[in-house]
Each structure stands twice: as structure tokens, then as C-alpha cells.
Amino acid sequence: MKNKLPPFIEIYRALIATPSISATEEALDQSNADLITLLADWFKDLGFNVEVQPVPGTRNKFNMLASIGQGAGGLLLAGHTDTVPFDDGRWTRDPFTLTEHDGKLYGLGTADMKGFFAFILDTLRDVDVTKLKKPLYILATADEETSMAGARYFAETTALRPDCAIIGEPTSLQPVRAHKGHISNAIRIQGQSGHSSDPARGVNAIELMHDAIGHILQLRDNLKERYHYEAFTVPYPTLNLGHIHGGDASNRICACCELHMDIRPLPSMTLNELNGLLNDALAPVSERWPGRLTVDELHPPIPGYECPPNHQLVEVVEKLLGAKTEVVNYCTEAPFIQTLCPTLVLGPGSINQAHQPDEYLETRFIKPTRELIIQVIHHFCWH
């Protein structure tokens, strides 16, 4: 029953107080089971049917899908339950205690993005869900901050095909219809060690990597010249060399060298296309030194994402907000949800607060966010 639902600020407080950190380092990684249980119970109190699914390949992580209403289509409101780790020495407040000060709500996940679920739950108090003409779905995912395993698994396994979806990432309530993707790779060169006094008796992995880097930088120039999307502040794919390590002593021929790099592709580019371009760029090194160069993924790749600017969802949301959609350089779960239905990224709070010490959401977002959620439910579920 709706009267069992706690007040807005208490919902928010409980979500922030329930740790759900995602991290690649096992010691820091946490299950989101307790948070999913909180959300599931509250949506059940509102009359929703709730399904909780374990996400394969994770450390006890779960997705939750709450649904109400009958028929095809409808609206999906989606978000992730996890947060990044925090640096205790840089926070001046308890990350797991919601505190309000000077028009700001502080806490880990206030903006990115536990708060979105508090807004949805609180708004639904004022919605007569028994009168919906189309279904309303609420999706809470796992591990967005690391592998995006929750969104990937949901998109691969669900039969749902809503009319549209909104992902409530912090966009300062400015609708986002496109973003770049992200690919990160480790380039490894296996040489042959030996004493530096006789270089011919070894294969110097650093020298081979020097050759490989030249070809990678040529690929970077080719990407910049060949691909453009003027709406982005950086209107071409970027390629960054982020980390390199090789060798162990000045008097030893380097036996191994490893380079970490990333590419941020435009929405029009496929992951297979990018992998092909990278392999082609490195082919001269591989052919000259067979078996000594390998390319491995550091993280599961994320494709670029775009909702067409003339799509009905874009037009409706732009009209409701009185604001044009934007494109951004950071990544979200949108590429995976977009495989099910047209998707926008739109939510309260600023992306500038995400992953920051003393993360906060400004209270000025409370009223317009509630109004927006009511408006999109009315438009997509009652018409």
C-alpha cells in the first residue's frame, strides 16, 4: 500500500545507507542484494509485480524489474544500483549518511544514481497506476560502474519491448540522445631476454613496442580524419595511450612490454569495425614478428549510442522540458537498453558530481524531477 512507503527523504536516506560498491578489485566489490531487497519491497508496496534476477558472472549481484499494467509497449525507467568506491580521506562527510546542507543532499550515490529511484518511488504516490493504459517498468541494474553486466544481461535475456526508455543518469535534467563508446585494450609484446652486451641474442620488446606505437598513432590520425560527428565537443573518435611498462633492468634485453590504450568511438562505428582497424594497424608488426604481439580486452567494450534526433521520444521529451537534446562523451547503459527500444538518458543531478568526494544532488532538482516523471508516465502510459 502507498501509505506504507516512507517519506521521500527517508527513502533517499535508506538507499544511501545501503552500500553497493562495484569494483574490479574483489576486496572492494560489494553485493547489491540488500539494496535490491529495499527497492523490491517498496515497489511491491505500490502494487508492482517484482522480479529479481541474479546476474551471471558477478559477485552476488542482482537486477530488479518492477512492472505494472497490461499490454504491449509502455515506458521503461532504468538506472543502476551500484556506486564507485570512495576515498575516505577526501570525504568530509560520512558517504553512507544522507546529509542536507545549503540546498544540497550529500552522500555516495546521491547523484550517480540511487537518488533516481527515490524520485520514482516518491512520485508514484501521486499516480493512479490502476488506470494505466500501457505498462510501466522500473529496471534496477548491477555493476554499471565496472562491466555493465546487469544491463548487458537484461538486454540479452528479456522479451520486453517497451515503446521507449529513460535512463536516469545525472544529466542536470538535460536530455541526452547520444554518446561515444569505450574500448580499452592491452597490447603485449613478448620478446626474448638476454644480456645487453649482445643485443643480437635477444629480441627487445620495447623496440617492437616502439614500432607498434607508431602504427597506433597513425591509426589515431586516420580516425580523426575519417570519422566526424559535429554535435560532439570532440567531434571525432579519440585514441589514448594511457599506461606502458616494460623491462626490469638497464643491462637486460627487455623480454616483455605492455601498453594500455583506449578508443572512444562515435555512435556510427561498430565494435567489430574498430577491432578490425586496430588489428590492421598492428598487422605489419605481427607479420614481421609472428607470435610476439597480442591484443586483449582490459574491460568489456561499450558501443556508442544514439537515438535519432527526429524520433518521437526525442520530440516529446524536448517539448515537455523546453530543451533540446544533447550528446555527451561519457558512457552509460543506453547502448544495451537501446537494443530493446528508443532510449534517452535524462535524470537529476550533475555529472560533474559523479565519482567525486562529497558527492551531492542539489535540492532544486526535486520539484522538476517529480514533474518530469509524472509527465512521461502520463504521456507514454496513459495515452
Curated annotation (Swiss-Prot):
The keyword Amino-acid biosynthesis applies. This is Acetylornithine deacetylase. Zn(2+) 1 binds at H80, D112, E169. Its main location: cytoplasm. Catalyzes the hydrolysis of the amide bond of N(2)-acetylated L-amino acids. Cleaves the acetyl group from N-acetyl-L-ornithine to form L-ornithine, an intermediate in L-arginine biosynthesis pathway, and a branchpoint in the synthesis of polyamines. It catalyses: N(2)-acetyl-L-ornithine + H2O = L-ornithine + acetate. GO terms for biological process: L-arginine biosynthetic process. Its EC number is 3.5.1.16.
